[in-house]
Amino acid sequence: MCQAGEDYAGPARREPPPVPRPSREQKCVKCAEGLPVVVIRAGDAFCRVCFKAFYVHKFRAMLGKNRVIFPGEKVLLSWSGGPSSSSMVWQVLEGLSQDSAKRLRFVPGVIYVDEGAACGQSLEDRQKTVAEVKRILENTGFPWHVVALEEVFSLPPSVLCCTSQESAGTEEAYKAAVDRFLQQQQQQQQRVLGAEAGASPAQGEARLHPSHGREPSGTAGYPTAAQTEALSRLFSSIKTLTAKEELLQTLRTHLIVHIARVHGYCKVMTGETCTRLAIKLMTNLALGRGAFLAWDTGFSDERHGDVVLVRPMRDHTLKEVAFYNHLFRVPSVFTPAIDTKAPEKASIHRLMEAFILRLQTLFPSTVSTVYRTSEKLVKAPREGCAAGPSGPSCLLCMCALDIDTADSATAFGAQSSSHLSQMPSAEAGMPTQPCCAAGEGQAQSCHREVGKRGDARACITEQLCYSCRVNMKDLPSLDPLPPYVLAEAQLRSQRGSVSEEIQEYLITDEEEDS
């Protein structure tokens, strides 16, 4: 019978296709012998051994196809405790084991960022989580670093500077690095075997293959109460969950890059999967970051210069990661995120995630289609903008800054026009008569002081990309921002003013020709 509120005009809801279950008669599609234990796609049933080989091959192939990590380099593994990053750490751990067919040739370390203060966790819950994190990291044997997000309030302004590095570049350079690494290993083995000729076999084996855990692990203590209060005040002042998630991601990246530079890491691995990158691509399009998709979703991200972010898990889906972690008992830690228990329409990130996952349920090729589209994006600056190594970059995300004039028909032009129309009149904040007309220097000093008070927000806003400008609108005051952001903004503004003053005294090419 009829029910209140029932919509009869809409189309019938389409039920998702049933998940195929492997039968006893079905065999593995790879070896055609073993009994299948998982079904990745429709008809692709794998046994335990073949699924592990398939999973490991994806990870190794991604590193081999993009030869960004050179032998002997120090690589920092960004571990959040979740399934994807835990699986990434497990892949590196197995790739460095003695019985591995082709051992990985880089030196790993692990970093965990405690974001409990931004997510509203109590101190007791954070201490329990950190204790569990340390227990898992100690079992890996890698050097590990546990840092709190509150440490962003003690970062130097140099974090926001893109330090240039020499291009490692060609295939010949990679082969030469491999040869040097193998020669160093052979020389080290010969020295160890010669020095330990009279030692026991166990001691010689221990010196020949030293444990990664013997390096000192950087463990940060708990932050001060003032830093925790400052971080809580910063995130509580932001109006929307979308801006909170974007700022959290930005601060986390700045902290990880700083730790990598301090400890000599030149690469940072993140555990972003194919599913997560597909959601990120659509989310960034909605946030106005379409010009930076190649950096935000590509295999490597070189925006920080000397520290390169790489994504070796970008060929794995969340389904594959979940199956692998369950079958091989990969340890992980559950930590509530900033959007935990948030409704579907609370932020653009949550809305886009629900949209993509719902489409994936009805159309299983949704994630792969979006992901393959991101692979075709090329890291090229937009024509007519200064996006080279010496060009300006965004103060927060550090991507190339698109600079348009106020009268251009772009989003930047609309924002600039809106800012100019909403600015209060100069007479409202200044006296009717010149307050210091005794000398030119005094008048200039007074004018600069008034401009400093009135345009502090505009000084930072003009150094942001379009997406970061939109997010900063949800922050009523810029005072809660970390000091290194404000200091770098002031330094860039002063450099710009000095550069404009110097340009008045320089002779251009046109003037020289005339």
Swiss-Prot record:
Listed Basic and acidic residues bias regions: 12-23, 206-215
GO cellular component, one term: protein-containing complex
Superkingdom in the source lineage: Eukaryota
Location of Phosphoserine modifications: S421, S425
In-chain residues carrying the UniProt-annotated modification N-acetylcysteine: C2
Pathway(s) where this gene product acts: tRNA modification; 5-methoxycarbonylmethyl-2-thiouridine-tRNA biosynthesis
Gene3D superfamilies: HUPs
Any Pfam family the entry gives: CTU2
Main location: cytoplasm
Protein localization: Cytoplasm
GO MF terms, alphabetically ordered: nucleotidyltransferase activity; tRNA binding
tRNA processing recorded as keyword: yes
Biological processes per GO annotation: protein urmylation; tRNA thio-modification; tRNA wobble uridine modification
Keywords: Acetylation, Cytoplasm, Phosphoprotein, tRNA processing
Region (Disordered) residue spans: 1-23, 192-222
Tagged with keyword Cytoplasm: yes
Function: Plays a central role in 2-thiolation of mcm(5)S(2)U at tRNA wobble positions of tRNA(Lys), tRNA(Glu) and tRNA(Gln). May act by forming a heterodimer with CTU1/ATPBD3 that ligates sulfur from thiocarboxylated URM1 onto the uridine of tRNAs at wobble position.
UniProt-listed HAMAP family: CTU2 (MF_03054)
Subunit composition and interactions: Component of a complex at least composed of URM1, CTU2/NCS2 and CTU1/ATPBD3.
Family (UniProt): Belongs to the CTU2/NCS2 family.
Entry protein name: Cytoplasmic tRNA 2-thiolation protein 2
Species the sequence originates in: Mus musculus
